[in-house]
UniProtKB/Swiss-Prot annotation:
Function (record text): Catalyzes the methylthiolation of N6-(dimethylallyl)adenosine (i(6)A), leading to the formation of 2-methylthio-N6-(dimethylallyl)adenosine (ms(2)i(6)A) at position 37 in tRNAs that read codons beginning with uridine.
Binding residues annotated for [4Fe-4S] cluster 2, in chain numbering: 157, 161, 164
Highest classification ranks of the organism: Bacteria, Pseudomonadati, Pseudomonadota, Gammaproteobacteria, Enterobacterales
EC number: 2.8.4.3
Domain MTTase N-terminal, residue spans: 3-120
The name this protein goes by in its record: tRNA-2-methylthio-N(6)-dimethylallyladenosine synthase
Subunit-structure text: Monomer.
Record key words, sorted: 4Fe-4S, Cytoplasm, Iron, Iron-sulfur, Metal-binding, S-adenosyl-L-methionine, Transferase, tRNA processing
């Protein structure tokens, strides 16, 4: 009988990536098949996020629902991972004693051993340590799921912004070796992946070891990834302005595979608030980066993160944020009302901004960003955009759907053989959440760059005597 695994994931793209790796790992070692139905699973895993308000209570509410399933099936294994587990592991065990496994973001690769231990002696396992890069060395060969894929290139953060729990839950910055990253991407390219999104809590801080023992820069890595045949679109997230150096900007000038879209969080337009946040950059320095980016890539569009109502934020501070939004002309944003994360310096600050002011500021900010996003979309009307075709449209099975470089969804009439390939379309209609296009060119007519085949990258980066991401043996 097939054993089944159910994973519920909250939070960032890194958590989504981690969950996909958990599924692949437990399929390879134990034969667990994913199911969307928790009631039919043999193992339930909750991959948590501690960024949002009341994250801990959300975890216990979910575990309470799963407790009912365990009462019906005592052999059911329940595991909690992610950042809340890393931060609150002991508390979870005390409050939810029926949880069998608690693991952190850096120990998910040990899940097979943890499950074996629970199956063997029914004693709970807690492992929320930070074993640096070992996690990546023991994951199975990646499996493509469509033409796009996420690839984690580093973990952790050293910036210690006063509101953020990431350094405490994922540890300090650790970069994967260059060859390991190229090996994984080449494997994905050989399976038909055309777009990769490089992931890290502070992705542009990557400083990985090269094959010759030297240390590579993030700009170097971008060019190496772009050289892999089949990888014709590269994204990365999330970046920090303090390490967005000129050599990265130069990649935008000479590497067409790097998309004309960047998510670069700024959080506030007020230098005083930025200082309280521990951001180590000013609004003017942020704008200088954007100016240089637009000199290198005039059509680049920018998105960002904003926190409103940070302790001490005045009306004048908020107005400076709104001015920055207008000056940069952001295309989109992820914006939130401040809520204190336990254990962070900001949690000890006086939360002196009235709740109504916070809500009003968030509304004003989001309305302005939405207006700017629609203006950007309208500018695309009549232009030709390159689309990576992801599949059929959600609105009509008779149409295809894909995304532009700036993440706009485009629906258009096409043929099934276009899925997983690029097409150029003319934008003929603009809607609130999507665009409509008409095909003007297929991939065969594009003359995309060919530099190095995935097979040659795999052969060049494979290490027979090392563990490596591709040869984990359960």
């Amino acid at each position: 009988m097939t054993k089944k695994l159910h994973i519920k994931t909250w939070g960032c793209q890194m958590n989504e990536y981690d969950s996909s790796k958990m599924a692949d790992l437990l399929d390879a070692t134990h034969g667990y098949q994913l199911t969307e139905v928790a009631e039919e699973a043999d193992v339930l895993l909750l991959n948590t996020c501690s960024i949002r308000e009341k994250a801990q209570e959300k975890v216990f509410h979910q575990l309470g629902r799963w407790k009912l399933l365990k009462e019906k099936n005592p052999d059911l294994i329940i595991g909690v991972g992610g950042c809340v587990a890393s931060q609150e592991g002991d508390h979870i065990r005390q409050r939810a004693h029926y949880v069998d496994i608690i693991f952190g973001p850096q120990t998910l690769h040990r899940l097979p051993e943890m499950i074996n231990a629970v199956r063997g002696n029914r004693s709970p396992v807690v492992d929320i340590s930070f074993p640096e890069i070992e996690k990546f060395d023991r994951l199975p060969e990646p499996r493509a799921d469509g033409p796009t894929a996420f690839v984690s290139i580093m973990e952790g953060c050293n910036k210690y912004c006063t509101y953020c729990v990431v350094p405490y839950t994922r540890g300090e910055e650790v970069s994967r070796p260059c060859d390991d990253i190229l090996f994984e991407i080449a494997q994905l390219a050989a399976q038909g992946v055309r777009e990769v999104n490089l992931l890290g809590q502070n992705v542009n801080a990557w400083r990985g070891e090269n094959y010759d023992g030297t240390t590579g820069s993030f700009a170097d890595l971008l060019r190496l990834v772009a050289a892999i045949d089949g990888i014709d679109r590269i994204r990365f997230t999330t970046s920090h302005p303090i390490e967005f150096t000129d050599d990265i900007i130069e990649v935008y000038r000479d590497t067409p595979e790097l998309v004309s879209f960047l998510h670069l969080p700024v959080q506030s337009g007020s230098d005083r608030v930025l200082n309280l946040m521990g951001r180590t950059h000013t609004a003017l320095e942020y704008k200088a980066i954007i100016r240089k980016l637009r000199e290198a890539r005039p059509d680049i569009q920018i998105s960002s993160d904003f926190i409103v109502g940070f302790p001490g934020e005045t009306t004048d501070d908020f107005e400076k944020t709104m001015k920055l939004i207008a000056d940069v002309n952001f295309d989109m944003s992820y914006s939130f009302i401040f809520s204190a994360r336990p254990g962070t310096p900001a949690a000890d600050m006086v939360d002196d901004v009235p709740e109504e002011d916070k809500k009003q500021r968030l509304y004003i900010l989001q309305e302005r960003i939405n207006q700017q996003a629609m203006a950007w979309s309208r500018r695309m009307l009549g232009t030709v955009q390159r689309i990576l075709v992801e599949g059929t449209s959600r609105k009509s099975l008779m149409e295809l759907s894909g995304r532009t470089e700036n993440n706009r969804v485009v629906n258009f009439e096409g043929t099934p053989d276009m899925v997983g390939k690029f097409v150029d379309v003319e934008i003929v209609d603009v809607y609130t959440n999507s665009l409509r296009g008409k095909i003007v060119r297929t991939e065969a007519e594009m003359g995309l760059r060919i530099a190095e085949s995935p097979e040659s990258v795999i052969a060049r980066t494979r290490k027979e005597n090392d563990l490596g991401v591709g040869i984990y043996q359960p």
